[in-house]
Structure formats: C-alpha cells, structure tokens
Swiss-Prot record:
It comes from Bacillus amyloliquefaciens (Bacillus velezensis). One of its GO terms (biological process) is signal peptide processing. It catalyses: Cleavage of hydrophobic, N-terminal signal or leader sequences from secreted and periplasmic proteins. CDD domains: S26_SPase_I (cd06530). The active site is at residues 45, 85. Its EC number is 3.4.21.89. Its main location: membrane. This is Signal peptidase I.
Length: 185
C-alpha cells in the first residue's frame, strides 16, 4: 500500500503539470492574439518582396503603441480574407501616380523596393504603375498597394481604403520556407 505522503506527492506533481500546461496555453493564446501572429502570403501581389505561400510573422502590437508609417508592409483584414500590402498613403495624404512616379501631397516619393520591378517593366516596354489620382485619403483611412503593381488588387482597383482597425499588424520577417528566412522591408 502506498503511504498517504506518496499519494499527496503524486497528486501535487499532477497539479503542477496541469498548472504549467494551462499557463502555457493561456500565454500562447495571448501571444497569438495580441503580440505576434503567423500569416501566409497568398498570391503574387507583393513580388519580389514577398512570394506566394511564404509565411510571415506579424507584429500586432504596433497598432496599439504607435502609428503606422508609409512604406510598412501590413496584413489587412478584409471581409472574407486577409491581404498583405504596403502602406502608401497615410490619413490626410493626397496620393497620385504620374509617369511611374509616386507623389504624396505633391512631392515625389522614392520607392526603392520597386527597383527590380521597374527595371523589368522598362525592359518590357511598359510602366510598372498606371497613372491615377490625385486621391485624397480620408483622415481615418490608409491607402495601400502591392509591390507587384501590375498584378495587385489594392486601394486603386477594388479593395479600397482601410481603417487602422482593419490592419492586423506589420510584417517583421519571413520564417518559412526555412532557406528564405529574412526581415521584410
């Protein structure tokens, strides 16, 4: 027969394990829902920056502690799916594209992340981004575009503008496939 002390010791060990598992699950849920979350890039709209089926980690705290910045790659919560795009226009901005040059509030804006796409477009005899605008971004919205401008549904052509509440967070790095791990810029 087992002594009372042995029974209490086993019971205590089981309770300790149960507490540890419950704490781990609660922490995982909190981290996943409020700090960082994995997302899958769906489609080619962010090529060559991000590729179809890559997995990215998204910082979800940004929207609670600071404002979004122009040029950040964000995950947007649409009606039925999420989208990965780049913030181009901030609330209150006027966005225009003319002769493959982005203008924000009437000033030229450099887009170094488009260098490879612009070079290929020029070699193929077309512009990367069709002219549009000027578009005035309302005070509570963001204007977004994909880096693969010829193959991206975004604020120009169907997705419209997004509120801060619709932005899940900012992309920090690609974590899969493992041979492609890198920071996103």
């Amino acid at each position: 027969m087992k002594s009372e002390k042995e029974k209490t010791s086993k019971k205590s060990a089981v309770l300790d394990w149960a507490k540890a598992i419950i704490i781990a699950v609660v922490l995982a849920v909190l981290i996943r829902n409020f700090l960082f979350a994995p997302y899958v890039v769906d489609g080619e709209s962010m090529e060559p920056t991000l590729h179809d089926r890559e997995r990215i980690f998204v910082n979800m705290t940004v929207k609670y502690i600071s404002d979004f910045k122009r040029g950040q790659i964000v995950v947007l919560n649409g009606e039925n799916e999420h989208y990965v795009k780049r913030i181009i226009g901030l609330p209150g901005d006027t966005v225009q594209m003319k002769n493959d040059q982005l203008y924000i509030n009437g000033k030229k804006v450099s887009e170094p992340y488009l260098a490879a796409n612009k070079k290929k477009a020029k070699q193929d005899g077309y512009t990367l981004t069709d002219d549009f605008g000027p578009v005035k971004v309302p005070d509570d919205k963001y204007f977004v575009m994909g880096d693969n401008r010829r193959n991206s549904m975004d604020s120009r052509n169907g997705l419209g503008l997004f509120t801060k509440k619709q932005i899940a967070g900012t992309s920090k790095f690609v974590f899969f496939p493992f041979n492609e791990i890198r920071k996103t810029k």
